[in-house]
Amino acid sequence: MNKLSINDVDVRDKRVLIRVDFNVPLKNGQISNNQRIAAALPTIKLALEKGAKSVVLMSHLGRPDGRPIHAASMKPVVAELENLLGKKIMFLEDCVGSKVEAACANPEPGSVILLENLRFHVEKEGKGKDAQGNKAKADDAAVAAFRASLSKLGDVYVNDAFGTAHRAHSSMVGVDLPVKACGLLMKKELDYFAKALENPARPFLAILGGAKVADKIQLIENLMDKVNEMIIGGGMAFTFLKVLNNMDIGGSLFDEGAKIVGRLVDKAKEKGVKLHLPSDFITGDKFADVAKSATASVASGIPEGWMGLDVGTKTNEVFQKVIEGAKTIVWNGPPGVFEFENFSTGSKQMMDSVVRATEAGTITIIGGCDTATCAKNSNATEKVSHVSTGSGTSLELLEGKILPGVAALSQP
């Protein structure tokens, strides 16, 4: 994961083409959350401070499926970016082609240029939909031409879009420039995951939640090669408990991943990984915040018509001690249905424990959309070591997969 960084590249008098992630939520044509734009500012500012002739920004927004759609235009980003950067932005009505190439060929020194949505072209991802809504595939020559046009817009390529680094799309792997570096946001992501996956301080603890074992098989198996302890929570804990303890789980989640639970437990024993499963639960009579609640344990089981929606008091106490003893923590998936206030206690208490561990010097990394939201709800985003900006990307990294967008970058 050690890649060339923009910190180590001479960009003076060069055009810097930066792949950013400006895929921001829009409401009535207005940006409702500017977090992703703000996250790219340090890289943009650094390029300008280092004397770049121009900074050319490219991103996707929404899912226009390879066709220009007004509602998915990057235009609303202009005012927000100007406000945050304190600088005039030149907006181009396309992202490739002769007009775009001409505008980017010799711009005023210090220019910041924002391209139109990359996903307005089917060649960006290689597939999309035609005007009639039918599936469309870009031919190889068109993809090559699209990539060649992008490559003419800069002298140095910088990728700061960690959230799409797991996709082998044209803007991630197809820019043909001699220098391809990671931006500051990408570097921070790679550095933190390297701390966990390449040389972790031990004991190394993985906390895994989520609904289905089947969705997390690769994640569990890969992390078992690396961690000392593993907490299994969320809906998938019930699949483990039914298989291992023959627990009555009522209407709780149970999935086809059940058939490999035995294999996963055997691997944990073989690798000396200590598995921690919940021992008690807060249950609900339906999947809703207003559900009636009760308590249950592994021994008592959960009656029919009820389901486990959070972990119980004893489980919280055990998990807290496990977290306190760890020196590196990777957390992907809350232990309960934190979206429902009545079933959020376990997730809140776990977040509090992780924050305290961080304060005591533990490296704590949060990945996955739900866990990141949980951190935000608890005002803990700045209180842990790192909250990843790319849920799909971080999951693939933790699964041991190679990220195409990272593999395409230059070595230092």
Curated annotation (Swiss-Prot):
Entries under SUPFAM superfamilies matching the protein: Phosphoglycerate kinase
Record key words, sorted: ATP-binding, Cytoplasm, Glycolysis, Kinase, Magnesium, Metal-binding, Nucleotide-binding, Transferase
UniProt-listed Gene3D superfamilies: Phosphoglycerate kinase, N-terminal domain (3.40.50.1260)
Residues annotated as binding Mg(2+): 211, 214-215, 370
Keyword Transferase: yes
Signal sequence coordinates: none
Record protein name field: Phosphoglycerate kinase
Source species of the chain: Aplysia californica (California sea hare)
Taxonomic placement: Eukaryota, Metazoa, Spiralia, Lophotrochozoa, Mollusca
Gene behind the chain: PGK
